[in-house]
C-alpha cells in the first residue's frame, strides 16, 4: 500500500498562510489544495477497497465490519464497526440464486468471493453486535414474509350480519318501526322496532367481537409456531437465534431434519442431501456440494448429511418468499368436534324451524279468525281493521316466530368449541405445550396409549461419560495417562473428526464451550477435558474424505480421513456398542497392542456392555481401521478402540407422570433405540415396568423381534408390550398401525426426521421442541416445548378438559333450547301468544350463547379428570348422564313457566304485564342457577373449585346485573315492568330450586346403553362414531 507520507501537505499549507500572497492568489491556492487532496484520497481508496474485498486476503482483512490497523504491536482488530456498502449487486445475486446460475457464482469469485463481498468470515461468521445485525437487516431486508392482512373486525361483523335469521329480524324491525311510528307517533311508536334493532345489533357485535378475538389468538399462536430456532456462527461462536433474526452474511449450521431458513450457498459439509419437493414438486432428493451445486433454498429440508451455509437472500428476496407472501394461513380450521357440533346445530335448528313454523301458522290463524285480543278488544275485525294495524300485527307475529328459531339454533356450540380451544391453547403454552393443530386438543382427551421415546423425554438428555473400557480393561479418570499415545491419537480422531459437534476455545483460555447434540457434547467434553484432546490440532492434521452421518436404522456414524503426516487413510466408526462390536475382529489394549477378538473375548466384552446397560448407561463404542482405498468406508475387520458408558438420568417427576397416566387408563409404551438392558433399567426406574409384573418377558421386545412377528402374532402381543428396544422408526410406525387397528387412540412422541411417518399415522403426534427436527415438528400436532414426559401428561389432562367443557356447555344450552321451544309452542297453541317477546328471546340467546360459553368453556383442568377412563371412539357425545340432567332441568323449567303463564295472574294477583315480566325474569334466572349445575355433570357438589374460576363468577355477576337493568330500567326496550322486592324474591326462589333438583337428580342411575339407541333410528350425530374425528386425513 502506498505510504501516506507520499502526499506531503505541509509545504502547501505553509504557502497558503504566507503573507506575500494577495487575496486572489490565496483563493487559487486553496482551490488547488482542495483538488490535490481529493485526488490523493481517491488514489488511496482505489488501493484500500480491493484489498479489503479480495477473497485471498487474510482473516484480518475478511473481518467484515472491522478495520485492520497496523500499530507498533502488530495487526490488531479495531472494535469500532465500519459502515459499508456491499461490494456486490444484491439483485444480481438474487437472480443467480433463482436460476441456479453456477457460472454467475464463479464470476463473483465462487462462494468464497461472495462471502468476502458480503464481509463474512466463513470460520468466524459475522459480528453479533446489534448494530452490525441491524445494518445488515437495513441493507438486505429482514427474514420475514409479507402476509396478506389478517381479517379485521368489520369482516366478522359482515359475517354475522349475513345470517338469514338476523336479516329477517332486521326486516321485521324495519316494518315494526315504520308502522309503530305511524300508529303511535315517534315518541311511543319506536320502542318495539327500535328494541329489536338494538337487540340484533348487540348480537352481531358480541358475535363479531368473539370471533375476532379468537382469530387474533390463533394468529398469535401461529406466529409462535413458525418461530423456529436456527444455529448460526457469530463472533466465532455457535448460537441459536430466531429464524426471523437471520440476516444476509450469516453462516448457518444445517443437519438432518432442519428446514433451511433462507436462500444460501454451501460453504462446507458432507453428504448433504436436500428435499426440494416443497418448492419444485420433485420427490427425488438433491445432492448439494461446494463444486457442482452449492445452491440451498429457503423452505426446503435437509434429509441427510450436515453443512454450513452462507446466507445470501432473506425474506421477500428468497425464491420461496414471493410464493409464501401470497399464502394466507387459514386459522379457521374446523376440528372434527366442531364439524359434529355443526351437524348437531343444524339438526336442532331444523327442529326449531319446524316449531317456529307451527307457531307462525297458529298465531296467524288465531289472529285472522279474531281469537286474539289486545287491551280487551279483538285485534282483527275484518275489513274494519286498518291495513297498517294488520301489517304491524303480522310483522310482530313473524318476528316472534323468527326469534324462536334464533333461540332454538344452538349457535353457541361452535363458539364454545372455539373459546375452549383458544383458551386451552393459550394455557397449554404456559404448560410447555404448543398446539399446531386444533383437533389434537380434543383428540388427546381420548388417548388410550402413549408411545414415548426415552432419551430427552423420560430422561434429562444431559449426558456424561461415567465409564470407559479399553478392550477388557476399565480405565478410571486417574489412569488415563497409562493409555498408549497411539491409541489416544486414534481416540482423538474417532471423537474429534467423527462428530457433528464443535469445541469453541476463547482467547482468554477459559473452559471450552461444546455444541452439538447431548451425546456429541458429552463425548467431546470427555475427550477434551479428560483425555486432553486439542480438536483444532486434530482437524489441521487430517483431511476428511467421506462422512456417513448417524442413522437411526444403522445406529452408527462413520468418517474416512487422510492423515497428512504419512498420507494414510483411516476409517472410524462410532455408535451403539453391540452394533460396532459386530464389525470388529480385533481390539486395542491400553498398551497399544492389538489382540484378536475371539469368541471368549467377544463374550467378555458383551458382558461388559450388558453390565453397563443394566446400570442405565448408554453404551457407545469406537472402532478403527487403516483403509485400503479412499472412497469407501469399510464396515468389517475393524479394531475396537474402546467403549464409553453415558449416564442420562430420569427426569424428576417422570415416574409420577407415568403413574398418573396409568390411573387415567392410558398405557405407556417406551420405544427406544437403546439396547434391551438399558431400556429395561430405565423402564423400571420410570415406572413403565413393574418388578411384580408376571408377563415381563412379553412386555419387553426388540425391534427386530417385533417386525419379524407374523401379523397375527403382532396383533396378539401388541397390547402386552411395554418396552421396545433397539427399534427403528419403521418399528415405531408398525406398532402405531397395530394399535390403531385394535381400536386404540394413539399418541406418539418423536424428535427425528424418520419419526415423521409415525407422527402422521398416530391420532396425536407429539414432537419435541428442543431436540426435535423441523420435519418432526411439521408432522406433529402438538410440540412439547421442554421435551418432558410430564408435559405429555399435562396435555392429556387438557385434552380431557376440552372435551369435558364442551359437554358441559352442550348440556346447559340444550336445557335452554328445550325449555324455550316447549313453553313458546304450548303458549302459542293454547293462548295464541308467546310469553317471551323477540327482544327477550334475543337477550336469552345472548347470555346463553356468549356469556354461557365463556363461563363454562374456560374451566381449568382438574386432577379428577385423570381418574376417569378415556372417552372411547364410539362413545356418544351426549351421554346418558347429560340426557338425565338436561331433561330433568328442562321439565322443571317448563312446568314453572307454564304455571306462571296460565295461573300466574291469579296466583300473584297481578296484571298481564307483570305476569309476563315474572316469566321472563324467572326463565333468565333459571339459566343463571343452572350454569352452576352444568359445572359438574356427575358430582353432587357443584361449588367445588368455584373460587379458582374468577371468570365464571364474574360472568354470573354481570348477567345478574344486566338482568336487573333490563327489568328495572329498560322497561320500554325489553317490554317489561318493574317488579317489587317480593316478586324478585319469588323469581329467585323458583330459579334457585334448580340447585336441590340438580343435586337429587344425580342420584338417579343411568343405563350404559346410549339413550337414543332405544329409538328405532337414532340420529348418528348423537350416537356419533368418533372414528372420523380421530383419524388423520
From Swiss-Prot:
Catalytic activities: Ca(2+)(in) + ATP + H2O = Ca(2+)(out) + ADP + phosphate + H(+)
Keyword Nucleotide-binding annotated: yes
Localization (cell): Membrane
Listed GO MF terms: ATP binding; ATP hydrolysis activity; calmodulin binding; metal ion binding; P-type calcium transporter activity
N-acetylmethionine PTM positions: 1
Domain of life: Eukaryota
PANTHER family reported in the protein's UniProt record: CALCIUM-TRANSPORTING ATPASE 12, PLASMA MEMBRANE-TYPE (PTHR24093:SF455), CATION TRANSPORTING ATPASE (PTHR24093)
Function: This magnesium-dependent enzyme catalyzes the hydrolysis of ATP coupled with the translocation of calcium from the cytosol out of the cell or into organelles.
Family statement drawn from the similarity comment of this UniProt entry: Belongs to the cation transport ATPase (P-type) (TC 3.A.3) family. Type IIB subfamily.
Identification of the protein by name: Calcium-transporting ATPase 12, plasma membrane-type
Record organism: Arabidopsis thaliana (Mouse-ear cress)
Gene: ACA12
